């Protein structure tokens, strides 16, 4: 979901690795241990939660989280909670990283000190207010000044203990006076619309005996200030909770009698002091935040066209895509946007075939084919993740769930056996699990996605042509990906492939490790399988699988998935679970009385239907066939005073649903829109608000069947597997080329050196693969020109945006230090560029 900004789309995403916490304060009980979990928050909205690590003051989480960020935010925060089964979970501490500081920690493991959490540390939100100073004549004929302070509204206030009933106090304060007034309480909203005006008499001539006339300009303007405090009205005995404050000196009225601005709320000046950072422990994180500013498609045509013809360039090492892989620090950086771009334009198979064939030609030993982290290997990995994720789930998820739920002991290392465990029983348990997983894989060939099969066919042909004396190389070239890089890693770490929500427990993790090792060896078709294990107990266990039927099953499977032109008519017809989870739904009006209006339900989406159930595994309470989904749109918060709501519109009614957070709401809207995109009766207009009390809240139309009053949002690609924005991927590639511009220039030098010098290669150029210096130089020149043109467009956009930026507007409230730094930097840049 992109934020539109005058024709330019802004995409935000974050990839997080939550490592471990250390030296948490001990629990004040006899055990001193804690049961802790970590949450990821956009400001204070939780978007992810790790598993609970029990009885530890140094919990290891080892969890990964990725999301597209659908809204603006100021801080990426991480809270460490201590679980309490009897009371509300307590916060131990938090890490808050300002959005502008995220690049400092980009893709680096970093230890952060946990900070104390109190009312002042949790301040967030902004306030819109107006000040107006006017002269009035009193009944006695004396002229005095009156200040009108209007509190218009607030946005994004924190939610305290699940609720927010805010009010504001407005105080005119000076050295010798303090006069306070209070707004009404606004119930159940963190975006209150106050629109209240308070009047203060600024000058009081009678109180000044030494002067017959009071000079506002000379005396009061530097001494008085307006202070606005936001509070959450509470029924608890501890009193109302502080939400934030702002202070405005009346000197802002020197130039004009009126003033209007947005302000960020701030903590109190005398807020409670934090504990020493090392009192609360620390948290290890790795954060990759990406922000893409994407222009319209025509801006990217030169660079995109250059990339898309990479498969046709001879040699392929002189192509723009291959050059990107050469200059990036890690091949994975280049592979991700390249594969997505080529998939979007249907060019991934010829491109991967070209670079894989070139790699095979450089390989000397058939036993090491595709074993390195080359661009070809990384591109195939990425293609399997994108195109094969549903195939992976259909194939492995039932077996993985059974292993996690049955929890049978499978330890076969005699040294690690627990008391009471039997080695033979454990071996039999493990053998049954391996058989179940192995057969699930080898019988899934007909479901393998076509794009993967086409790539495997090209790998097989290239390997067989290069190593004609090795009859098995046509199998190992394919198995090195489908087994070694696809199935085995998914079995080993199912949470990384969304097969499980979190890391598995230690016993299950050990079982999956043993299964993964065995399946990987079975798939490798190694001639000396027992010798491939370092551990003697694994070699002993593998004797169970020395029968020829296992090798035959692997070969039949590999033959099937690497066949040319195979198409599976059943693959699209099979029900595929696309997304599931708990959400809140509103009753659809079948019973008007005696029923709770909002209920928690388990939702499940397949490529056939959208259903909800009382709980996971139950029979569906309601089902919507995909062809009956006419539109999926956000629902305005004012409809039910609830955030993160959306509507699934059907022919007869709309189903109103509340997701758990903004990220989850975006994910559901996107996937539901995708699967219903091809429906012939999709709506073009809809009602953005609910139908309540006999009319639509948005347009006031009385009929529940009245046509919509707002246009439906733009559709997404209909392919249920892939949602790729070609312009965004080209922008990503531009950013990488721009980041590694010095390497591009160095590569140009290397081409020139190779063209004129025939001797030993200079060491500084030896890292580049340059088969044809002239062709490579030609492509480099085009790449640098394309990147330069886009860089100029970005620079012009920044200059134009800076000219239009107003400090104190709703988009850029006063009080953001990082924005002040931005203003200063842009001012300096503009000065230098004149």
UniProtKB/Swiss-Prot annotation:
InterPro entries: C2_dom (IPR000008), C2_domain_sf (IPR035892), PH-like_dom_sf (IPR011993), PH_domain (IPR001849), Ras_GTPase (IPR039360), RASA3_PH (IPR037774), RasGAP_CS (IPR023152), RasGAP_dom (IPR001936). One of its GO terms (cellular component) is cytoplasmic side of plasma membrane. Residues 1-112, 123-263 form the C2 domain. Its main location: membrane. Residues 346-561 form the Ras-GAP domain. The record marks 371 as: Arginine finger. This is Ras GTPase-activating protein 3.
């Amino acid at each position: 979901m992109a934020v539109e900004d005058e024709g330019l789309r802004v995409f935000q995403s974050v990839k997080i690795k939550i490592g471990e916490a250390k030296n948490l304060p001990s629990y004040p009980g006899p055990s001193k241990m804690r049961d802790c979990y970590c949450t990821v928050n956009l400001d204070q909205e939780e978007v992810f939660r790790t598993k609970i690590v029990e009885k530890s003051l140094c919990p290891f989480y080892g969890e990964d989280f990725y999301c597209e960020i659908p809204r603006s935010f100021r801080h990426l925060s991480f809270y460490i909670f201590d679980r309490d089964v009897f009371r509300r979970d307590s916060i131990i501490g938090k890490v808050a990283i300002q959005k502008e500081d995220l690049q400092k920690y980009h893709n680096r493991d970093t230890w952060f000190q946990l900070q104390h959490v109190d009312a002042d540390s949790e301040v967030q939100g902004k306030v819109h207010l107006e000040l107006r100073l006017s002269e009035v004549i009193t009944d006695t004929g004396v002229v005095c000044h009156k200040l009108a302070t209007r509190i218009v509204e607030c946005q994004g206030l924190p939610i305290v203990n699940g609720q927010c009933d805010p009010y504001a106090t407005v105080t005119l304060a000076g050295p010798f006076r303090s006069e306070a007034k209070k707004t009404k309480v606004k119930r159940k909203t963190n975006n209150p619309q106050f629109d209240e005006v308070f009047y203060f008499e600024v000058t009081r001539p009678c109180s000044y005996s030494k002067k017959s006339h009071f000079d506002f300009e000379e005396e009061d303007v530097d001494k008085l200030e307006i202070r606005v405090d936001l509070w959450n009205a509470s029924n608890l005995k501890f009193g109302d909770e502080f939400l934030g404050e702002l202070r405005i000196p009346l000197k802002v009225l020197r130039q004009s009698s009126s003033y209007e601005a947005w302000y960020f709320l701030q903590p109190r000046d005398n807020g409670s002091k934090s504990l020493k950072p090392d009192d609360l422990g620390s948290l290890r994180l790795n954060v990759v935040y990406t922000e893409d500013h994407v222009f319209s498609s025509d801006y990217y045509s030169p660079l995109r066209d250059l990339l898309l013809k990479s498969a046709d360039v001879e040699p392929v090492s002189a192509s723009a895509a291959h050059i990107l892989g050469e200059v990036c620090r890690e091949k994975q950086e280049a592979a991700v946007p390249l594969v997505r771009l080529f998939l979007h334009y249907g060019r991934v198979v010829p491109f991967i075939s070209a670079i894989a064939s070139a790699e095979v030609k450089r390989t000397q030993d058939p036993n090491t084919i595709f074993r390195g982290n080359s661009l070809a290997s990384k591109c195939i990995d990425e293609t399997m993740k994108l195109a094969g994720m549903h195939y992976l789930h259909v194939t492995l998820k039932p077996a993985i769930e059974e292993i996690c739920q049955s929890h049978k002991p499978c330890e076969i290392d005699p040294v690690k056996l627990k008391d009471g465990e039997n080695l033979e029983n454990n071996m039999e348990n493990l053998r049954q699990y391996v058989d179940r997983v192995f057969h699930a894989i080898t019988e899934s060939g007909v479901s393998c996605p076509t794009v993967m099969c086409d790539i495997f066919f090209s790998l097989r042909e290239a390997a067989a042509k290069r190593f004609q004396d090795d009859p098995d190389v046509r199998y190992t070239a394919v198995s090195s990906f489908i087994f070694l890089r696809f199935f085995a890693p998914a079995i080993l770490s199912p949470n990384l492939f969304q097969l499980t929500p979190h890391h598995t427990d230690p016993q299950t993790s050990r079982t999956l490790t043993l299964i993964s090792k065995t399946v990987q060896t079975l798939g490798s078709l190694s001639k000396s399988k027992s010798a491939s294990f370092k551990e003697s107990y694994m070699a002993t266990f593998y004797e169970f699988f020395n029968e020829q039927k296992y090798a035959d099953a692997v070969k039949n499977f590999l033959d099937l998935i690497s066949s040319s032109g195979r198409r599976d008519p059943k693959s699209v017809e099979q029900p595929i679970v696309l997304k599931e989870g708990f959400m809140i739904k509103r009753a659809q009006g079948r019973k008007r009385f005696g029923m709770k209006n909002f209920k928690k339900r388990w939702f499940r989406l397949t490529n056939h239907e959208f259903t909800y159930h009382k709980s996971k595994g139950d029979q569906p309470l309601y089902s919507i066939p995909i062809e009956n989904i006419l539109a999926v749109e956000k629902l305005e918060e004012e409809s039910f005073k609830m955030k993160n709501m959306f509507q699934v519109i059907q022919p007869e009614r709309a189903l109103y649903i509340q997701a758990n957070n903004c990220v989850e709401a975006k994910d559901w809207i996107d996937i539901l829109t995708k699967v219903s995109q091809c429906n012939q009766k999709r709506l073009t207009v809809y009602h953005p608000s609910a139908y309540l009390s006999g009319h639509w809240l948005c347009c006031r139309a009385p009929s529940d069947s009245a046509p919509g009053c707002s246009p439906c949002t733009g559709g997404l690609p209909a392919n249920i597997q892939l949602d790729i924005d070609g312009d965004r991927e080209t922008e990503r590639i531009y950013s990488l080329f721009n980041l590694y511009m010095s390497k591009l220039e160095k590569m140009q030098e290397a081409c020139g050196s190779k063209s004129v010098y025939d001797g030993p290669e200079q060491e500084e150029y030896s890292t580049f693969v340059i088969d044809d210096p002239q062709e490579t130089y030609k492509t480099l020149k085009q790449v640098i020109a394309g990147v330069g043109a886009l860089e100029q467009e970005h620079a012009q956009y920044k200059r134009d945006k800076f000219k239009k930026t107003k400090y104190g507007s709703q988009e850029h409230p006063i009080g953001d230090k990082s924005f002040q730094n931005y203003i200063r930097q842009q001012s300096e840049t503009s000065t230098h560029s004149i």
